[in-house]
Amino acid sequence: MFSLDTDDDTTPAATAEPRNSYLEEKAFKSRTLLIFGGITDSVAADVTRRLIALDADSAEKPIDILVSSPGGHLESGDAIHDVVRFISAPVNMIGTGWVGSAATHLFLAAPRERRVCLPNTRFLIHQPSGGAGGQATDIAIQAQEILKARHRIAHEIARETGKPVDVVLADIERDRWLSAQEAVEYGLVSRIIERKTELHR
Protein backbone atom coordinates (compact mmCIF):
# COMPACT_ATOMS: atom_id res chain seq x y z
CA MET A 1 0.00 0.00 0.00
CA PHE A 2 1.31 3.42 -0.94
CA SER A 3 0.14 6.68 0.54
CA LEU A 4 1.04 10.20 -0.54
CA ASP A 5 0.29 13.24 1.58
CA THR A 6 -1.87 15.24 -0.81
CA ASP A 7 -2.65 17.78 1.91
CA ASP A 8 0.82 19.26 1.50
CA ASP A 9 0.32 22.62 -0.21
CA THR A 10 3.81 22.45 -1.70
CA THR A 11 2.80 19.44 -3.83
CA PRO A 12 0.48 20.32 -6.72
CA ALA A 13 -2.58 18.10 -6.71
CA ALA A 14 -2.18 17.41 -10.43
CA THR A 15 1.13 15.59 -9.84
CA ALA A 16 -0.01 13.45 -6.93
CA GLU A 17 -1.93 10.81 -8.92
CA PRO A 18 0.65 10.32 -11.70
CA ARG A 19 3.39 9.98 -9.09
CA ASN A 20 1.29 7.50 -7.16
CA SER A 21 0.55 5.50 -10.32
CA TYR A 22 4.24 5.45 -11.24
CA LEU A 23 5.24 4.12 -7.82
CA GLU A 24 2.42 1.56 -7.89
CA GLU A 25 3.51 0.30 -11.30
CA LYS A 26 7.19 0.06 -10.35
CA ALA A 27 6.41 -1.80 -7.12
CA PHE A 28 4.02 -4.18 -8.87
CA LYS A 29 6.54 -4.98 -11.61
CA SER A 30 9.14 -5.74 -8.94
CA ARG A 31 6.59 -8.05 -7.24
CA THR A 32 6.81 -6.00 -4.05
CA LEU A 33 3.88 -5.06 -1.80
CA LEU A 34 3.90 -2.71 1.17
CA ILE A 35 1.72 -3.04 4.26
CA PHE A 36 2.32 0.19 6.16
CA GLY A 37 0.03 1.67 8.81
CA GLY A 38 -3.12 0.24 10.34
CA ILE A 39 -4.64 -2.95 8.95
CA THR A 40 -8.22 -2.34 7.85
CA ASP A 41 -10.74 -3.99 5.53
CA SER A 42 -9.69 -1.68 2.69
CA VAL A 43 -6.00 -2.50 3.21
CA ALA A 44 -6.82 -6.22 3.25
CA ALA A 45 -8.86 -5.91 0.05
CA ASP A 46 -6.04 -4.03 -1.68
CA VAL A 47 -3.29 -6.41 -0.58
CA THR A 48 -5.21 -9.60 -1.35
CA ARG A 49 -6.20 -8.30 -4.79
CA ARG A 50 -2.55 -7.63 -5.60
CA LEU A 51 -1.45 -11.00 -4.25
CA ILE A 52 -3.92 -12.80 -6.49
CA ALA A 53 -2.88 -10.72 -9.51
CA LEU A 54 0.83 -11.37 -8.93
CA ASP A 55 0.15 -15.07 -8.42
CA ALA A 56 -1.73 -15.16 -11.73
CA ASP A 57 1.23 -13.43 -13.39
CA SER A 58 3.65 -16.07 -12.07
CA ALA A 59 3.12 -18.82 -9.54
CA GLU A 60 6.87 -19.52 -9.35
CA LYS A 61 8.43 -16.09 -8.82
CA PRO A 62 8.47 -14.92 -5.18
CA ILE A 63 6.44 -11.98 -3.91
CA ASP A 64 8.09 -9.66 -1.37
CA ILE A 65 5.90 -8.02 1.29
CA LEU A 66 7.40 -5.27 3.44
CA VAL A 67 5.49 -4.88 6.71
CA SER A 68 5.60 -1.90 9.07
CA SER A 69 2.33 -1.81 10.96
CA PRO A 70 1.03 -1.44 14.52
CA GLY A 71 -1.70 -3.93 13.70
CA GLY A 72 -5.38 -3.24 13.41
CA HIS A 73 -8.49 -5.25 12.67
CA LEU A 74 -7.84 -8.91 13.46
CA GLU A 75 -10.11 -10.34 10.76
CA SER A 76 -8.53 -8.05 8.15
CA GLY A 77 -5.16 -9.46 9.14
CA ASP A 78 -6.67 -12.95 8.92
CA ALA A 79 -7.74 -12.27 5.34
CA ILE A 80 -4.20 -11.33 4.27
CA HIS A 81 -2.72 -14.22 6.27
CA ASP A 82 -5.00 -16.77 4.60
CA VAL A 83 -4.55 -15.45 1.05
CA VAL A 84 -0.74 -15.53 1.44
CA ARG A 85 -1.13 -19.25 2.14
CA PHE A 86 -3.84 -19.70 -0.49
CA ILE A 87 -1.80 -18.57 -3.49
CA SER A 88 0.88 -20.73 -5.10
CA ALA A 89 3.64 -18.12 -5.43
CA PRO A 90 6.16 -18.12 -2.56
CA VAL A 91 5.97 -15.05 -0.32
CA ASN A 92 8.83 -13.37 1.53
CA MET A 93 7.81 -11.33 4.58
CA ILE A 94 10.20 -8.49 5.41
CA GLY A 95 9.73 -6.69 8.71
CA THR A 96 10.77 -3.06 9.01
CA GLY A 97 9.91 -0.30 11.47
CA TRP A 98 7.60 -2.17 13.78
CA VAL A 99 5.42 -5.22 13.31
CA GLY A 100 2.77 -5.49 15.99
CA SER A 101 -0.43 -7.22 16.96
CA ALA A 102 -2.47 -8.26 13.89
CA ALA A 103 0.52 -7.39 11.69
CA THR A 104 2.58 -10.04 13.48
CA HIS A 105 -0.21 -12.53 12.78
CA LEU A 106 -0.19 -11.90 9.02
CA PHE A 107 3.63 -11.82 9.07
CA LEU A 108 3.57 -15.43 10.27
CA ALA A 109 1.73 -16.54 7.12
CA ALA A 110 5.07 -17.07 5.39
CA PRO A 111 7.26 -20.07 6.28
CA ARG A 112 9.96 -19.26 8.82
CA GLU A 113 12.74 -19.44 6.24
CA ARG A 114 10.94 -16.71 4.27
CA ARG A 115 10.42 -14.42 7.26
CA VAL A 116 13.21 -11.85 7.66
CA CYS A 117 13.56 -8.36 9.08
CA LEU A 118 15.75 -5.31 8.83
CA PRO A 119 18.09 -4.51 11.75
CA ASN A 120 15.98 -1.92 13.58
CA THR A 121 12.64 -3.72 13.37
CA ARG A 122 10.66 -4.20 16.58
CA PHE A 123 7.96 -6.81 17.06
CA LEU A 124 4.97 -6.81 19.41
CA ILE A 125 2.91 -9.83 20.37
CA HIS A 126 -0.07 -9.63 22.68
CA GLN A 127 -3.58 -10.93 23.15
CA PRO A 128 -6.48 -9.39 21.21
CA SER A 129 -8.61 -6.74 22.83
CA GLY A 130 -12.03 -5.31 22.10
CA GLY A 131 -14.63 -3.01 23.48
CA ALA A 132 -17.74 -4.68 24.83
CA GLY A 133 -21.10 -2.96 24.93
CA GLY A 134 -24.81 -3.65 24.82
CA GLN A 135 -26.80 -6.17 26.80
CA ALA A 136 -25.11 -8.43 29.32
CA THR A 137 -25.56 -11.47 27.08
CA ASP A 138 -23.91 -9.63 24.17
CA ILE A 139 -20.99 -8.61 26.38
CA ALA A 140 -20.56 -12.24 27.45
CA ILE A 141 -20.56 -13.38 23.81
CA GLN A 142 -17.94 -10.77 22.88
CA ALA A 143 -15.76 -11.78 25.82
CA GLN A 144 -15.98 -15.42 24.77
CA GLU A 145 -14.98 -14.54 21.20
CA ILE A 146 -11.94 -12.62 22.47
CA LEU A 147 -10.87 -15.68 24.47
CA LYS A 148 -11.26 -17.86 21.37
CA ALA A 149 -9.17 -15.42 19.34
CA ARG A 150 -6.52 -15.37 22.08
CA HIS A 151 -6.12 -19.13 21.97
CA ARG A 152 -6.17 -19.20 18.17
CA ILE A 153 -3.41 -16.59 17.96
CA ALA A 154 -1.36 -18.37 20.63
CA HIS A 155 -1.57 -21.66 18.74
CA GLU A 156 -0.55 -19.94 15.49
CA ILE A 157 2.47 -18.30 17.12
CA ALA A 158 3.41 -21.60 18.78
CA ARG A 159 3.13 -23.52 15.52
CA GLU A 160 5.22 -21.01 13.56
CA THR A 161 7.92 -20.45 16.20
CA GLY A 162 8.19 -23.86 17.83
CA LYS A 163 7.39 -22.41 21.25
CA PRO A 164 5.10 -24.36 23.61
CA VAL A 165 1.54 -23.00 23.61
CA ASP A 166 1.58 -22.38 27.36
CA VAL A 167 4.73 -20.27 26.99
CA VAL A 168 3.13 -18.21 24.22
CA LEU A 169 -0.06 -17.75 26.24
CA ALA A 170 2.01 -16.38 29.11
CA ASP A 171 4.01 -14.15 26.78
CA ILE A 172 0.94 -12.55 25.19
CA GLU A 173 -0.83 -11.96 28.50
CA ARG A 174 0.73 -8.49 28.39
CA ASP A 175 2.53 -6.59 25.63
CA ARG A 176 5.71 -8.44 24.70
CA TRP A 177 8.19 -6.37 22.69
CA LEU A 178 11.08 -7.99 20.83
CA SER A 179 14.07 -6.50 19.07
CA ALA A 180 15.15 -7.91 15.72
CA GLN A 181 17.63 -10.27 17.39
CA GLU A 182 15.09 -11.30 20.04
CA ALA A 183 12.59 -12.02 17.25
CA VAL A 184 15.13 -14.34 15.64
CA GLU A 185 15.68 -16.12 18.96
CA TYR A 186 11.92 -16.37 19.52
CA GLY A 187 11.37 -17.85 16.05
CA LEU A 188 9.30 -15.03 14.55
CA VAL A 189 11.95 -14.45 11.88
CA SER A 190 14.71 -16.61 10.45
CA ARG A 191 17.38 -13.93 10.07
CA ILE A 192 18.20 -10.24 9.96
CA ILE A 193 19.20 -8.73 6.64
CA GLU A 194 20.60 -5.33 5.70
CA ARG A 195 20.58 -5.49 1.90
CA LYS A 196 18.04 -6.61 -0.67
CA THR A 197 20.70 -8.82 -2.21
CA GLU A 198 20.65 -10.93 0.97
CA LEU A 199 16.95 -11.70 0.60
CA HIS A 200 17.11 -14.28 -2.17
CA ARG A 201 20.26 -16.11 -1.09
Report each predicted region and the residues it spans:
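Terminal-region recognition feature
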Residues: 1-201
